Every structure is written in structure tokens, then in C-alpha cells.
């Protein structure tokens, strides 16, 4: 594991990124972007174990299963890429969880309201701070509606604890 700069971090704010690697797959976790929607650990609990440290154990499933699960992440908190020499078919690693995924422009952005939870934004979107600085550009954004988040305007899962 290592720390690095988050490429989608808020302007001027250093965020932590954790790296998990095998010979065939590199997984990045940006904890400050995570809304704790639980898609990862509900889909692949043998890899994503929130109660353990480290909480990601890549040996628990095939790289292809991990890739499919990361592609379900609604916040871009989990990302992946294939290292040089990976045996994984590159065509399988083109989804929204890929570090190389390009956000395609859409005509409409879809915003879903979660009962007693956040707003799920799907589609090419950009979020700007009050000074006009771009703080996030993504195809998956989860916005806080409860006001408890420590990562405004993004949901950090704080509503689960009230």
C-alpha cells in the first residue's frame, strides 16, 4: 500500500489513496470519496471486508471478479488498472472503475434520490466550489443531503450513524 494524490480530489486538498496490487491487477481506494454504499462488500465479501485491515484482499477472487465489482462503485472511490504483463484481457478492464475510463458526454444527467440518504448522480457531471474551482468531474457522484458529511458536498456515509 502507498499514499498518493487522488486525481479527482478537491482543489487544494490532499486526499489519501490506498493501493492494493497483485501481478494482474492494481486496485486504488480513495477513502474520502467513499459513501459506504456497500456495493463492493455485498457483491464480493471475500475480497472487500470493511471490518478487517487491510480491508481489501485481492487473493479472495479472480481479477475479473474484482473488476466487475469495482465497476459497480457509485462514487469512484474504488478504481483499478492492469499492471504491465497482466494476464487479464484488457477488453474486460474498460469499465467505469478503470483509471483510464473516459466519461462520455450525455444529453441528460440522471439524479436518483435515496430514501433517507444521498443523491446519486449518473452521467457526465462537474462540481464546482463557490469560487468556481472544479472539485470533481465524474460519471458517478454521490451528494450529501443530510448535512452531516465531513466531505461537502459529497456523501461520506455519515447518515448511517445518526
Model region roles, listed by residue range:
Residues 14-35, 48-68, 82-89, 132-142:
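Ferredoxin-like iron-sulfur electron-transfer modules
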Residues 28-44, 60-76, 112-114, 144-153:
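Cysteine-centered iron-sulfur cluster-binding motifs in ferredoxin-type domains/subunits
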Residues 1-24, 89-91, 95-98:
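Iron-sulfur (Fe-S) cluster-binding modules
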Residues 38-46, 50, 118-133:
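A short, structured beta-strand/loop element
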Residues 121, 141-143, 154-155:
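Short, structured motif recognition centered on aromatic/hydrophobic residues
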Residues 42, 51-53, 81-83, 153-156:
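Short Cys/His-rich "knuckle" micro-motifs
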Residues 15-16, 150-162:
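Short histidine
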Residues 3-7, 58-85, 99-123:
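Short Fe-S-cluster ligation motifs
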Amino acid at each position: 500500500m502507498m499514499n498518493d494524490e487522488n486525481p479527482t480530489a478537491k482543489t487544494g486538498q490532499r486526499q489519501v489513496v490506498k493501493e492494493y496490487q497483485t501481478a494482474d491487477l492494481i486496485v486504488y481506494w480513495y477513502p474520502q470519496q467513499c459513501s459506504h454504499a456497500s456495493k463492493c462488500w455485498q457483491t464480493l465479501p471475500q475480497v472487500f471486508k470493511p471490518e478487517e485491515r487491510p480491508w481489501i484482499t485481492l487473493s479472495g477472487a479472480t481479477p475479473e471478479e474484482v473488476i466487475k465489482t469495482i465497476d459497480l462503485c457509485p462514487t469512484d472511490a474504488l478504481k483499478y488498472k492492469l499492471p504491465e504483463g497482466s494476464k487479464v484481457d484488457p477488453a474486460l478492464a474498460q469499465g467505469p472503475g478503470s483509471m483510464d475510463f473516459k466519461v462520455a458526454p450525455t444529453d441528460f444527467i440522471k439524479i436518483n434520490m435515496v430514501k433517507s440518504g444521498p443523491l446519486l448522480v449518473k452521467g457526465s457531471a462537474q462540481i464546482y466550489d463557490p469560487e468556481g474551482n472544479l472539485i470533481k468531474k465524474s460519471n458517478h457522484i454521490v451528494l450529501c443531503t443530510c448535512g452531516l458529511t465531513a466531505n461537502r458536498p459529497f456523501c461520506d456515509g455519515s447518515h448511517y450513524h445518526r
